[in-house]
Amino acid sequence: MTLRWAMWLLLLAAWSMGYGEAFRCYTCEQPTAINSCKNIAQCKMEDTACKTVLETVEAAFPFNHSPMVTRSCSSSCLATDPDGIGVAHPVFCCFRDLCNSGFPGFVAGL
């Protein structure tokens, strides 16, 4: 086999593989209890992150309800400063397959 044919076969193999496979994120469009938001969606090729937005947190004792979140695939996720004061709806971004199952700083079951 000549070098030319080898190059064509290599080019054809690379082309047939496509650009890669999109990753998956947990999704819930409406505010949902953090432990209940478990729908899995295949993200679009242009999506680069999984996004979680903290919508509500119980502010009164006895704190026995789970925080409400929305989750989605995102093509432009801008995380908020986790130490920021007064952020109404903190945003968490992550960049792996199914990485948005939790929320930083929240411990389930407490």
Swiss-Prot record:
Molecular function in Gene Ontology: acetylcholine receptor activator activity; cytokine activity
UPAR/Ly6 domain mapped to chain residues: 24-73
Keyword check for Signal: yes
Keyword Transcription attached: no
Database matches in InterPro entries: CD59_antigen_CS, Ly-6/neurotoxin-like_GPI-ap, Snake_toxin-like_sf, Toxin/TOLIP
Induction: Down-regulated in the cornea under pro-inflammatory conditions.
Recorded coiled-coil stretches: none
Signal peptide: 1-22
Location(s), subcellular: Secreted
A cellular-component GO term for this protein: extracellular space
Alphabetical GO biological process terms: locomotory behavior; negative regulation of cell migration; negative regulation of cell population proliferation; negative regulation of keratinocyte proliferation; neuromuscular process controlling posture; urokinase plasminogen activator signaling pathway
Disruption phenotype: Severe palmoplantar keratoderma, reduced adiposity, protection from obesity on a high-fat diet, low plasma lipid levels, and neuromuscular abnormality (hind-limb clasping).
Tissue expression as described in the entry: Expressed in skin, eye, whole lung, trachea, esophagus and stomach. Widely expressed in various tissues including spleen and thymus but not pancreas. Expressed in macrophages, dendritic cells, T and B cells. Expressed in lung specifically in ciliated bronchial epithelial cells (at protein level). Expression is decreased in lungs of asthmatic model mice. Expressed in the cornea.
Keyword annotations of the record: Cytokine, Disulfide bond, Secreted, Signal
Task performed by this protein: Has an antitumor activity. Was found to be a marker of late differentiation of the skin. Implicated in maintaining the physiological and structural integrity of the keratinocyte layers of the skin. In vitro down-regulates keratinocyte proliferation; the function may involve the proposed role as modulator of nicotinic acetylcholine receptors (nAChRs) activity. In vitro inhibits alpha-7-dependent nAChR currents in an allosteric manner. In T cells may be involved in regulation of intracellular Ca(2+) signaling. Seems to have a immunomodulatory function in the cornea.
Subunit structure and binding partners: Homodimer. Interacts with PLAU. Interacts with CHRNA7.
Name used for this protein in its record: Secreted Ly-6/uPAR-related protein 1
Organism: Mus musculus (Mouse)
